[in-house]
Regions:
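Hydrophobic (often cysteine-bearing) scaffold residues that line and stabilize catalytic clefts
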Residues: 13, 62, 195-198
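Long, well-structured alpha-helical subdomains associated
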Residues: 213-257, 262
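Peri-catalytic and regulatory segments of divalent metal-dependent proteins
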Residues: 25-152, 167, 205, 209-210, ...
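DG-centered beta-turn motif at the end of beta-strands
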Residues: 133-134, 199, 241
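Post-HEXXH active-site segment of zinc metalloproteases
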Residues: 143-177, 218-221
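Metalloprotease/metallohydrolase-associated module, dominated by Zn2+-dependent proteases
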Residues: 168-216
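Bacterial N-terminal signal peptides that target proteins for export
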Residues: 1-12
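C-terminal motif of bacterial Sec signal peptides marking the signal peptidase cleavage site
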Residues: 20-23
Length: 266
């Protein structure tokens, strides 16, 4: 989609508005506050880490492995889900044979794990962290939050474009449509990074309760950081950068080891 000068000005305004709204959108849990020195240390660790290497894995092996890990995680995930107060705590595991390092939670109540996760993971704890992370998106009701924020963003974008164009907007529905698309994208950004950090936080509790080693689980974050190459987040990023995630994971791990039995609520 190409933007003329008028659309570009509105795009910037909508994105800035989305960023401001994101600052007001607080997670339900008291996430660890990550200091810059911890992020710098995590960035140095990621930069020094070897490049992740994929190993050959059959679909049968991958399905068996993630299914076993999911079943081991399920009681812990359900316990955290009930504690948070979410009523729907029954999810369905789905496997994708695509060799992409990816996973996601869908609005159908599913947790989708790609074959690439199994290929690059160096331990069961790393795969468990990914599965628990997607469980956490359901537990924290992130999907509905994202849908709502996109709807609000689309409305803001459309109204902003209409106000800017005035009467001319009546004759340029495409520009209004573009404004709504831009607004929906900005709305999605208002929650996404904080949702990812909250999902990491909850997943640390889930894998710990399931008996997995927290230090082993963090390895997948180091690998993802190595693959991604980003050291800091920008306004347009949907995920926090690798060093931010690793540093936050370490603080969550310390919180758990200090005796916190469940995620801290705000």
């Amino acid at each position: 989609m190409f933007l003329n000068n008028t659309q570009a000005r509105v795009s910037i305004g909508v994105l800035l508005l989305g960023n401001l709204l994101g600052g007001c959108a607080t997670p339900k849990h008291a996430l660890p506050e990550v200091q810059d020195n911890r992020v710098y240390a995590a960035a140095a660790e990621i930069n020094a880490a070897p490049d992740p290497i994929a190993r050959a894995v059959s679909d049968e092996e991958a399905v068996a492995r993630i299914s076993a890990l999911y079943n081991k995680l399920k009681p812990a995930g359900t316990a955290v889900c009930r504690y948070v107060g979410e009523h729907h705590c029954d999810w369905e595991l789905t496997y994708s044979p695509e060799e992409e390092v990816n996973a996601y939670a869908s609005d159908a109540g599913t947790v989708v794990i790609y074959k690439g996760i199994v290929q690059y993971a160096r331990s069961d704890a790393e795969i468990a962290m990914v599965i628990a992370h997607e469980m956490a998106h359901h537990i924290a009701n992130h999907i509905r939050e994202s849908q709502n924020s996109q709807a609000v963003g689309a409305l803001v974008g459309g109204v902003a474009m209409a106000l800017l164009l005035g009467d001319a907007a009546m004759y340029n529905s495409q520009v209004i449509s573009d404004g709504m698309q831009i607004g929906a994208y900005a709305g999605a950004l208002t929650f996404s990074r904080k949702q990812e950090m909250e999902a990491d936080y909850l997943s640390a509790y889930i894998i710990s309760r399931a008996g997995f080693d927290l230090d082993a689980g963090r390895g997948i974050l180091v690998s993802l950081g190595r693959m991604g190459g980003r050291t800091t987040s920008t306004v347009l990023d949907t995920h926090p950068a690798g060093p931010e995630r690793v540093a936050a994971w370490d603080l969550a791990s310390a919180e758990i080891r200090a005796g916190s039995p469940m995620p801290r609520k705000r």
